[in-house]
Amino acid sequence: MDATYVGAYGRLKVYEVDFLKKDFLEHLISLDKPSDFSSVLYASVYKEDYDALTSIYREPDLTEMAINRHLVRMNRIAAFAIPPLAKNALTAYISKWDIENIKTVISSKFLGHGLKETEMFIVSFRDIPMGLIGGVLTNEDYRNMMNLPNVEAIINYLTRYGYGSYMLQFIEDYRKTGDISPMLYSLDRYYYARLLESLKYYNGDEGPVINYIRSDIDRINLNTILKGKKLNISYERFFSGLVDGGNIPINAIHDFYGNSDILSMIDSIKRYYDLEDAKNKYASDGNLYHFDVSMRNIMITKYMGTMSMLPLSLDSIFYFIIRAEIERQNLRTIYEAKLHGAPKESIYDLMINGVV
C-alpha cells in the first residue's frame, strides 16, 4: 500500500455511495415508457446533470446527454483525486473517450452526417469533453473537426496530436479503397499500446488493472474475428486491426479464425474464456453481442472485486472509473430499449453485472 493514495481513496469512497444500486436498475427495467425512465433517473443523483442541460436539450436527447455528463463528472472526481505519480496511467486510460469521439466524428463525416446528428454521441460535447480531463482534445477541437469538409481534413487536423500522425500511415489505403476501418482500428492499437506503457508497476499491486486491460484487448480482438467470420471476410482483410498486448497471442487468434464457423471458434477459445452461455444464446438468435456482454461480465467478475479490496493503490481509482463506465453502459442499454420498445426480458441479456 502507498500512503500517497490515502487522500484519493477517502475522496472516492465518499462518492461511491452515488453509484446506482442493482434494485434501482431493475426498477428502471420494469418501467414501461422512456418518459418514466427519465423521471425516475432525474429523481436520483443525476438531477444535477439534467438541470445543467435542460435549457439546451429536449427528450430523448436530454437523458442521453445527462448520462454522458454524469460519466464525465465521475471521471473528473477520480482525475482530481489521483496522486501525481499515477496521473499518467489515468490520463492514458481516460483518453479512450478521445478515441471513441474521434471514431464517431470520422464515421459521421464518412456517412455525411452533420453537427446535430453527431454531437449526441460525443462524450461530452456541450459540457466538458472527456479528453480535456486528460489534457488532450478540447471542446473547440471537436467543433472544429465536425465542421471540416471531409475525413482527410479531420486526419490532418489530428496530426497536431499523436492520433493523427499515427493514422496517416493508412491514408493512402483509404484513398484507394474508401474504407475507413483500418484508420479506426489503428486508433485502438495506439490507445492500448500507450495505456500498457503507462501502467508500469509502481507498487507491484497494479496487477489487477493490467490484467483487466489485457482482457479488454482480448475482448476487442475476439469481437473483430467474430464479426469477420460472420461476414465471411478473409483474415488478411482485418489482421491489421488486431491489437497486441492481450492474454491471447495474435498467432492463437489466427488459429481460432481457422475454424469453420463461429460455434467451433468459441469452443477453441474455451481454454482462455468460457463463453458457453453466450454460444447457446447466439445459436438461438444469431446475435454476436452476447459474446461481448459475456466477455465484459467475465472481466468484471474476475478483476473488479480484487480492485475494490486494494484500497491504497491505483486499483481503487480504476475500480471507481470502470464502475462509472459500467453504470453509463447499463443506463444507455435500458434507455435505448425503452425508446425502441424492446421486451423487458431481453434487456437482462445486455446488462453488465457483478459490481452492484
UniProtKB/Swiss-Prot annotation:
Keyword Cell membrane: yes or no?
Answer: yes
* Membrane-protein topology: Peripheral membrane protein
Q: Name one GO molecular function term.
A: ATP binding
Q: What is its main location?
A: membrane
**UniProt xrefs under InterPro entries:** ATPase_csu/dsu_sf, ATPase_V0-cplx_csu, ATPase_V0-cplx_csu/dsu, V-ATPase_V0D/AC39_subunit, V-type_ATPase_csu/dsu, V-type_ATPase_csu/dsu_dom_3
Database matches in Pfam families = vATP-synt_AC39
GO biological process: one example? proton motive force-driven plasma membrane ATP synthesis
Q: Where is the signal peptide?
A: none
| Cellular compartments annotated | Cell membrane
GO CC aspect terms: plasma membrane; proton-transporting V-type ATPase, V0 domain
Q: Which UniProt keywords apply?
A: ATP synthesis, Cell membrane, Hydrogen ion transport, Ion transport, Membrane, Transport
Q: Describe, as the record does, how this protein assembles with itself and its partners.
A: Has multiple subunits with at least A(3), B(3), C, D, E, F, H, I and proteolipid K(x).
What NCBIfam families is this protein classified in? PRK01198.1-2
Q: What this chain does, per the record?
A: Component of the A-type ATP synthase that produces ATP from ADP in the presence of a proton gradient across the membrane.
The entry sums up its family as follows: Belongs to the V-ATPase V0D/AC39 subunit family.
- UniProt-recorded name of the protein: A-type ATP synthase subunit C
Q: Which organism is it from?
A: Thermoplasma volcanium (strain ATCC 51530 / DSM 4299 / JCM 9571 / NBRC 15438 / GSS1)
- Chain's gene name: atpC
